[in-house]
Amino acid sequence: MLELKFVRAHPEIVRADLTKRGDTEKLAWVDEVLEMDRRARELTVAIGDLRNRRNVISREISQARKAGNDITELLAEAAGLPERIKEVETERETLTEAVRYRLMRLPNILHESVPVGKDDSENVEIRRWGEPEIPAFDLENHGALAVEHGWADFERAAKIAGSGFYFLKGRLALLDMALQRFAMDILVEHGYTPIIPPYMMNRAAYEGVTDLADFENVMYRIDGEDEYLIATSEHPMAAMYCDEIFEEKDLPLRLAGLSPCFRREIGAHGLDTKGLFRVHQFHKVEQFIYATPEQSWDLHEELMANAEEVFQRLGLPYRIVSICTGDIGTVAAKKYDLEVWMPREERYREAVSCSNCTAYQAVRLNIKVRNPTEFTEKRYVHTLNSTAIATSRAIRAILENNQNEDGSVTIPKALRPYLYGSETL
């Protein structure tokens, strides 16, 4: 959410950003916000004047009564003031809500380095790591391979939960757990505090994290309750300190969340229709940082470096792309994706998303940091997030990149201590 005072002071920046995004439908909102805000402030003055008149007229009635003067008109005016005040307050509240509605849906201001593009086809590659390989033998579909080895059961999961769910069994269940602990151990080495968050959030908290109008259709809502299953641990970690004030000495605050993630809509994408890449439920280790504005851009690079370390130590080839204006969404000011090599498709696929949301979430959630020299001065923190590992996608990458001609799968060396020293699944 953009601060109202920012829109007042810099409407030209907001307009230029919307134009850069190609979101011209919202250009009219900027003028609407300014006009409704101006009118709401006028009404605030009017309410103050009416309340003052209510106090004054009480004295005038008392004085007129003592002087024996006619007080009929004064009494009539006094009787009408409460209703008039209520009417003006209602009008102001309507305007204030209309302003907030637009501010909640205006996108974040993009960093100047974000590339311009219409969709994900125009994201810009930044760098690559590792050598993508296409084996001489025909790779087996990761889902079919897992079923053949008794590592996964999709049919029985569909029978009890529907499509898009799965049982992980035996060695693959252990691999999922190993990936979680492996990524968490790396983050702990770098000073991140492990967090296991609530797996549900109420609507008020979720609206502070993201625009539910855009996001609600991919989430599971608890029937009859004002609760949602979380789509990522980023969301409860972002809302964790809502309506609180940090001391600057306590920032940056680095968190590492571990949770299942629940997504309703998964789509159908060719080779992904059966398997582990797009599913309704998966485990993820998520990085999250609260920071001062001065710290946040360096920390954005730190988050990306941490995710790269995870994939480098797993030996999985990847590339980093900078997300363009047409693909970045509402919340992030800048976003990178790490795309891991999938040899069966002979292309890179998204495995990590790394965002600097600047103050956008903090304004919605009212999370501030106090100026250490001016105790009463406060400003909004910046929030940043990045996947460390989403286990289902990493498992697919391992089953494809490390698949051998005999159908066995070589375990990355970094994971072997978590899998009893085994070299293959």
Swiss-Prot record:
Lineage: Archaea, Methanobacteriati, Methanobacteriota, Stenosarchaea group, Methanomicrobia
Entry keyword annotation includes NADP: no
Gene source species: Methanoculleus marisnigri (strain ATCC 35101 / DSM 1498 / JR1)
Record key words, sorted: Aminoacyl-tRNA synthetase, ATP-binding, Cytoplasm, Ligase, Nucleotide-binding, Protein biosynthesis
Protein family membership: Belongs to the class-II aminoacyl-tRNA synthetase family. Type-1 seryl-tRNA synthetase subfamily.
GO molecular function annotation: ATP binding; serine-tRNA ligase activity
Pathway given in the UniProt record: Aminoacyl-tRNA biosynthesis; selenocysteinyl-tRNA(Sec) biosynthesis; L-seryl-tRNA(Sec) from L-serine and tRNA(Sec): step 1/1
Cellular component, GO annotation: cytoplasm
Its job: Catalyzes the attachment of serine to tRNA(Ser). Is also able to aminoacylate tRNA(Sec) with serine, to form the misacylated tRNA L-seryl-tRNA(Sec), which will be further converted into selenocysteinyl-tRNA(Sec).
GO biological process, one term: seryl-tRNA aminoacylation
Subcellular location: Cytoplasm
PROSITE patterns for the chain: AA_TRNA_LIGASE_II
Descriptive protein name: Serine--tRNA ligase
